[in-house]
């Protein structure tokens, strides 16, 4: 069976060798996910070869230019800005993003599969540093309704100034009970992306970043106890109920990946137009459905520092809050 680039990375993670010192501020290790702390200070100096801002947002079929501006932020010093969207409306999101970033960044590449979308922007003139740019997608069902809830993933493989990266924006199956279905979708996406262009002489990605509505929920706790902990700013105590971390600890998904500490509140499900959790009859348990995870494959050559991992609570036009990460790389060539 032909194995894609991402699948190759996942297979390589089974090797016993573990690179040392490639990720600063390591806090704890699950079987599959390494939890890392945040170094809040970044001066965008020459000490970092590549600073990447990564944003994911389930839009719930709604968009405004004001939300797009808030999504990309006011700090425009990043070398790359990666935006992953789920349940994106039929509007020309690419045009809105380019308008918001017109003074600082240009669109380098995009991958779109209906409502699942991915955009990579770079500083002006950064197209000169692109040595490879490929797109791929994997469909896993869904699509109906006005919101077009397509499930699956889109991906961009990019060689930026000699650093080979893969970005994956995904939307996995919903509902607490569908853990195994999400696990299976993760594996299928990993094995399928870029498999048609794979050959034994190709380099695997040096860094792979997954972002999206992974839809893993809190399990083993009801809505009201969970909300009570959140209201008391004790939501960190809920991480032990998080299906994503549980499944990673079982070795089912995201082996070898890193994620920042879940210091922000669960990002789903909110009443639209507010910062209040779901008041409908369903009374859903708040969950960290929206995540950003990354894997450094070449630990001898890349040192990574996570400078932020947070939700954007000022955006209220969806039942999800966007999540943003700021990751800087030092590359030893």
Annotate each language-model stretch with its function.
Residues 1-119, 178, 186, 249, ...:
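N-terminal, active-site-proximal structural segment of metallo-dependent hydrolase catalytic domains
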Residues 160, 168-173, 177-333:
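Catalytic lobes of large eukaryotic enzymes
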Residues 87-173:
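Structured beta-strand-rich core segments of catalytic domains in phosphoester-bond hydrolases
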Residues 37-43, 64-71, 93-95, 104-108, ...:
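Eukaryotic intrinsically disordered and solvent-exposed regulatory patches
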Residues 63, 92, 130, 176, ...:
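Activation segment
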């Amino acid at each position: 069976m032909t194995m894609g680039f991402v699948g190759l990375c996942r297979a390589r993670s089974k090797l016993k060798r573990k690179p040392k010192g490639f990720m600063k501020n390591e806090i704890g290790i699950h079987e599959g996910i390494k939890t890392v702390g945040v170094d809040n200070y970044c001066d965008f100096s020459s000490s970092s070869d590549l600073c990447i801002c990564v944003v994911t947002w389930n839009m719930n079929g709604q968009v405004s230019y004001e939300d797009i501006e808030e999504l990309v932020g006011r700090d425009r010093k990043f070398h790359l800005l990666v935006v992953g969207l789920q349940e994106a409306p039929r509007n020309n999101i690419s045009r809105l993003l380019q308008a918001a970033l017109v003074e600082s960044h240009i669109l380098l590449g995009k991958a779109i599969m209906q409502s699942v979308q991915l955009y990579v922007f770079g500083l002006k003139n950064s197209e000169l540093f692109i040595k490879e740019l490929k797109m791929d997608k994997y469909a896993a069902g869904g699509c109906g309704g006005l919101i077009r809830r397509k499930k699956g993933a889109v991906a961009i493989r990019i060689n930026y100034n000699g650093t080979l990266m893969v970005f994956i924006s995904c939307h996995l199956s919903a509902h607490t009970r569908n853990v195994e279905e999400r696990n299976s979708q993760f594996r299928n996406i990993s094995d399928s992306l870029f498999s048609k262009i794979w050959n034994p002489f190709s380099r695997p990605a040096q860094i792979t970043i997954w972002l999206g509505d992974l839809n893993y929920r809190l399990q083993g706790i009801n809505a009201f106890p969970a909300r009570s902990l959140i209201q008391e700013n004790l939501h960190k105590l809920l991480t032990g109920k998080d299906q994503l971390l549980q499944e990673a600890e079982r070795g089912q998904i995201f082996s070898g990946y890193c994620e920042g500490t879940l210091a922000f509140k669960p990002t789903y499900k909110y009443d639209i137009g507010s910062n209040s959790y779901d008041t409908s009859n369903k009374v859903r348990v708040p969950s960290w459905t929206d995540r950003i995870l990354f894997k450094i494959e070449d630990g001898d050559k890349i040192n990574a520092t996570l400078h932020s991992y947070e939700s954007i609570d000022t955006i209220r036009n969806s039942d999800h809050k966007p999540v943003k990460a700021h990751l800087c790389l030092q590359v030893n060539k």
